A protein has these predicted regions:
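Glycine-rich ThDP/TPP pyrophosphate-binding loop and its adjacent helix/strand module
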Residues: 97-98, 152-153, 158-342
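Cofactor-binding active-site loop characterized by glycine-rich and histidine/acidic residues
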Residues: 80-216, 415-419, 423
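N-terminal leader/propeptide and maturation segments of large enzyme subunits in energy/redox metabolism
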Residues: 325-388
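Cationic, amphipathic, low-complexity segments that mediate targeting or membrane/lipid association
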Residues: 1-5, 9
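N-terminal capping segment at the start of a domain
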Residues: 56-72, 225-228
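Non-catalytic terminal/interface segments that mediate subunit docking, oligomerization
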Residues: 360-423
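Short, positively charged and aromatic/hydrophobic N-terminal segments
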Residues: 10, 20-25, 34-42
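A short glycine/serine-rich beta->alpha loop
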Residues: 49-52, 66-75, 103-111, 153-164, ...
Length: 423
C-alpha cells in the first residue's frame, strides 16, 4: 500500500474511522490511536521485511561508498546501524518534510558522529541530501562533514562531538519536551530518539544523563544502543565487564534486548517503547560491525575492528558492494523499491501533518493566549531582562554569583529550564 491511508484502510481491523481517535484494546493492551498515529503500526501491515533489508543494504552501500570516495571515515558502524535508522525514518519518526523546523516534531539525536555516513545516507533517501552531496563527504566546505553539524532544515538536530555528549542532548530535549507538554498539551507531544554506541556508553558524561533521565521518568525518551562490541582496536570485552542492561535498569529505565539487524525486532521494540508510560527506554540492539562487508578474497569482513575507522579498500570494497546488491562502478544509486518506500513515508507524513495542524488549529482557537505564548517561545526573540535588579555581594563564590543570576532569570524568562548539581 502506498500513499495516505483511507477510511477503508482502518475498517479491515474492525475500526471505524470515527473510533480511531478513542483508546482501543488490541491484544489486551490499551492503545491510544492518536498517540500512535505517527506510524500506523497497530492498524496496517508493516513494510515487507525483504524490502526493509533492501533499504538497509542501500544505506550500507551509500555509507561505505562515501568513505571509500573520501578515502577517510568510518564505514563499519554505519553499516551495522543501517537497519535501525531505516525502520525509524521509514515508519516512526514524525516531522514535516515541508517545514523541518515545526516545533512539534520528533527529535533524533546521533551521538557517535563518526557514523555520519549512516545518517546522511538515510536523509538522502528522505530527500534532505542529494547523491552528489554524499559524494562530497569530508570535503572542505561540503554539507556532509565527517561529523554532522546541526542543520534543522536538513534533519540534523545536533552537532556530534565527543562521544557521550549526544546522550545529554537527548535527555535535555526530553526534559524540554516534558516542560512544553505541561504548558501546551497535545500540540507538544513528541518523542525524543537517540542513537548511542559502545563508545558513548563508556564515557562518564553518559552516566549522569542516564541517571537523571531515569529519576525523572522520561517516558518520551527512547535510546537505541548499537551494541556491536567492537571499538577502534579491540573488542569491548577487553576493556569492560559491566552489564549495561542492569546498569540502566538500576537507573529506572525500561530495557529491551533485540537483534539490532532485524527490522521486525526493531519495529517491535520501538512499538513497545512508545507504549511505555512511566520510564525512558533503552533498546539494546546487538548489531554486526560492517554488516555485509567482504574481504578481498570474498570471505566475511564482518565484526572486524579494521572496518571501524578506515575505508574498506580495493577488492574488499568491490566485493562488499556486490554482496549488498550494488554496482561498484555506480554505487551512488537509490534502488527503485527503496525510493518508493520513502515516497510512501513522505505521503504518510503529509497525512499525519494535516491531522497535526488541524489539532493545533483547534487548540489555538480554544486557547489563544497559550497559542501566542507557544509562538513566542519559538520566535527566537529574547525577553526583556531587568539586569539592574541583580545585586551581587562582594567576594562571593562564583557558584553563588551564578545562582544569583540564574534566580533572577528564572523569574523573568518563562521558557528557561534550570537545575544545578551539588559539587
Amino acid at each position: 500500500m502506498t500513499g495516505a491511508r483511507k477510511k477503508s484502510d482502518f475498517l479491515c481491523c474492525g475500526l471505524d474511522i470515527k473510533s480511531y481517535l478513542c483508546p482501543v484494546k488490541i491484544n489486551k493492551q490499551e492503545i491510544n490511536p492518536l498517540k500512535e498515529y505517527s506510524n500506523y503500526n497497530y492498524f496496517n501491515n508493516m513494510n515487507d521485511k525483504k524490502l526493509m533489508n533492501l533499504a538497509a543494504d542501500n544505506i550500507r552501500i551509500l555509507a561505505a561508498s562515501m568513505v571509500e570516495k573520501a578515502n577517510s571515515g568510518h564505514p563499519g558502524g554505519a553499516m551495522g546501524g543501517a537497519d535501525f535508522v531505516n525502520v525509524l525514518f521509514s515508519e516512526f519518526l514524525v516531522y514535516d518534510p515541508e517545514n523541518p523546523a515545526w516545533e512539534g516534531r520528533d527529535r533524533f539525536f546521533l551521538d557517535p558522529g563518526h557514523m555520519s555516513p549512516m545518517l546522511y545516507s538515510t536523509l538522502a533517501l528522505a530527500g534532505k541530501f542529494t547523491l552528489d552531496e554524499l559524494k562530497e563527504f569530508r570535503q572542505w566546505g561540503s554539507p556532509t562533514p565527517g561529523h554532522p553539524e546541526r542543520d534543522i532544515m536538513r534533519g540534523i538536530e545536533n552537532t556530534s562531538g565527543p562521544l557521550g555528549q549526544g546522550h545529554t542532548f537527548a535527555v535535555g530535549a526530553a526534559i524540554a519536551a516534558k516542560f512544553m507538554k505541561a504548558r501546551f498539551e497535545e500540540v507538544m507531544n513528541q518523542t525524543i530518539y537517540a542513537y548511542i554506541s559502545d563508545g558513548g556508553i563508556q564515557e562518564e558524561i553518559s552516566q549522569g544523563a542516564g541517571r537523571i533521565a531515569g529519576a525523572l521518568g522520561l517516558d518520551n525518551l527512547i535510546m537505541f544502543y548499537d551494541a556491536n562490541d567492537i571499538q577502534l582496536s579491540t573488542e569491548t570485552k577487553d576493556v569492560t565487564i559491566e552489564d549495561t542492561a542492569k546498569k540502566y535498569e538500576a537507573w529506572g529505565w525500561k530495557v529491551i534486548k533485540i537483534d539490532g539487524n532485524d527490522a521486525d525486532a526493531i519495529r517491535g521494540a520501538l512499538n513497545e517503547a512508545k507504549a511505555e508510560a512511566e520510564r525512558p527506554t533503552l533498546i539494546i540492539g546487538h548489531t554486526v560491525m560492517g554488516k555485509g562487508a567482504r574481504k578481498a578474497d570474498g570471505s566475511s569482513y564482518e565484526a572486524n575492528c579494521a572496518t571501524h575507522g578506515a575505508p574498506l579498500g580495493g577488492d574488499a570494497y568491490v566485493n562488499t558492494i556486490k554482496n549488498l546488491g550494488g554496482n561498484p562502478e555506480n554505487p551512488f544509486t537509490v534502488f527503485p523499491e527503496v525510493a518508493e518506500l520513502y515516497a510512501k513515508r513522505a505521503a504518510e507524513l503529509k497525512s499525519i501533518m494535516a491531522e497535526k495542524y488541524a489539532v493545533k488549529a483547534a487548540w489555538a482557537k480554544a486557547n489563544p493566549e497559550k497559542a501566542a505564548k507557544l509562538e513566542l517561545f519559538f520566535s527566537g526573540k529574547a525577553p526583556e531582562v531587568n539586569w539592574a535588579a541583580i545585586e551581587q555581594k562582594a567576594n562571593v563564590a562564583t557558584r553563588a554569583a551564578s545562582a544569583t543570576v540564574l534566580s533572577a532569570l528564572a523569574t523573568q524568562v518563562e521558557n528557561m529550564v534550570d537545575r544545578k548539581s551539588v559539587v
